[in-house]
Amino acid sequence: MSSKPQIRPAENGEHCRSKMENGMDSMAPPTLSTYTPEEMVQQMKELITENNELKEAMKLHNQAMKDRYEELSIWREKQKEEREFYETKFKEAKQCLLAKCVENEQLQQQLQSLKEREEGAEMEGCATPEKEARQLKSKVQRLQAEKADLLAIISELQVKLNIASAEDSFVEIGMNEEVNRTARENQDNSSEMASNIAVYIRSKSADESKNLESEELTVSQLLCCLRNETQRREKLEKELQDHKERLSKMENETSNCLESGTQTNQEEESSEAIGSEVESLKKQICALFKELQEAHEKLKEAELIQKKLQEKCQTLEKVNSAAATELEEKQQLIYTIKKLELQVESVQAEVKLEQAKTQDEKTRYSSLQDAYNKLLAELTEAMKTISEMKVKEHDRVDKVVVEELNAKVLLAEQALAAKQLQMDEMKQLIAKQEEDLETMAVLRAQMEVYCSDFHAERAAREKIHEEKEQLAVQLAYLLKEQQNLEDLGRSSLAEMQNRHGARAPDREHSPRLVQRGTGSQEWPEQRNISIYSCPKCEEILPDLDTLQIHVMDCIN
């Protein structure tokens, strides 16, 4: 019975019935007799009404939950749409930024080319490759700074994407303002750079030369100090060694004097004098030790300074080598740019000539068209006069006048046909020239491609040529080493043969350690074997190559 209240109370009035049953169980059974049937019916009706009310409340609650869920789904869809809208706006802003960056770079390149031309015209005598390299470095740094600014703008836009839709217009306005501001700043910087770059480069080159000279002077001075300190240290060490030897001698003498106790007073006086000399020598040694320690400390300091200066020299050498390579690359780039500029100028001159020709032909065409229009007007007037004459003097017209008019009409038609032919020819010429202009643009693009391919092939050939030269140098070096080794082998063989020939008569005088039974049959075999024997250790070897190797090892 205790489990019944946990069941759903809104269905079929089970909750109230369970309460009633619990109450009836707790009370005595006679209480049932107190309820009349009418009261029981009323209670049942009340329970049914309560059950219906609970069902309606549950339905309303479920409907409200459904409505809330639908509102949440609509809100989520709106959020997704807003997010997609913001993302599209961000992408569009990014594309605009990239386009502006490309335009900015193109404008900068045009400005740089114009500035280089102006500076080349103004400073042809004083312009050097180093200055051009520094200019390019400063431009690269400026472009890097602009790139960093653009990246910062993009990050700001990414942060602003998470803000509400009301701020989108503000973001776009700010972005456009920043792009315009960067473009203006770039233009201002480019105009200022043209005026200040020469002075800056001169001052920088002078400062660098002064710094290098001062560093070289300090290095030379420190090296001189180091040499002096090392010489002084060697001298002090020698003096210390001499004093130590003298001290050891004096100590030996004093020990001898102490052992021989039965010596005279003169010897005692000499021993006292020796003791005083020993003390003075000890003092000198202490002073020398102090000087040595000071010299050691100075040496350590000088060595540290030398290491630092060597590191500085290495870094400067690396910087110089990198600058030299950059200079070479930039000189090559400048050379190629000048070549391309000359080619572009020649192409532009050709295009201008073609344009002038087309302009002349257009003027001719317009003049011919005017003449044609005039002739048409004259023809129409003549036709009108003919028609009028035919109408007015149909019967009185003379044959001569008619023939003259017919001749004029024929001449006008012939002139019109000739003019029409000329106009057709001019149209064909104009079409051909337009095709030539299109082919000129295609040929220009092909020329640029061929130029880049030619430069790439040229660089590859230069690399191959350098590698060939290096290999040739290595081959010559190896051939020289081989020749030297062969000469050494021959000389060593000659020396060995000489030694072997010098020792041969000694061996003839030496007694033979041969068994008696062998006799003259084993002698040629021994001679053949002794041909490939070592002259130093008399080791028998099978062939000449192993003999040479063994002789070299044995001599060493």
UniProtKB/Swiss-Prot annotation:
Disulfide feature: none
PROSITE patterns: ZF_CCHC_NOA
Biological process (GO), any one: autophagy
Ranges of biased composition (kind: Polar residues): 253-265
InterPro entries (UniProt xref): CC2-LZ_dom (IPR032419), NEMO_N (IPR021063), NEMO_ZF (IPR034735), Optineurin/NFkB_EssMod (IPR051301)
Cellular component terms (Gene Ontology): autophagosome; cytoplasm; Golgi apparatus; nucleus; perinuclear region of cytoplasm; recycling endosome
Keywords, alphabetical: Autophagy, Coiled coil, Cytoplasm, Cytoplasmic vesicle, Endosome, Golgi apparatus, Metal-binding, Zinc, Zinc-finger
Coiled-coil residues: 38-164, 219-487
Binding site for Zn(2+): C534, C537, H550, C554
Zn finger spans (CCHC NOA-type): 526-556
Domain of life: Eukaryota
MF terms (GO), sorted A to Z: K63-linked polyubiquitin modification-dependent protein binding; zinc ion binding
Region (Disordered): 1-33, 245-274, 496-524
Main location: cytoplasm
Composition bias, Basic and acidic residues: 11-22
PANTHER family to which the protein is assigned, alphabetical: NF-KAPPA-B ESSENTIAL MODULATOR, OPTINEURIN
Assembly, per entry: Binds to linear ubiquitin chains. Interacts with LC3 family members.
Record remark on domains: The LIR (LC3-interacting region) motif mediates the interaction with ATG8 family proteins. Ubiquitin-binding motif (UBAN) is essential for its inhibitory function, subcellular localization and interaction with TBK1.
Record-given protein name: Optineurin
The species this protein was found in: Gallus gallus (Chicken)
Name of the gene encoding the protein in the UniProt record: OPTN
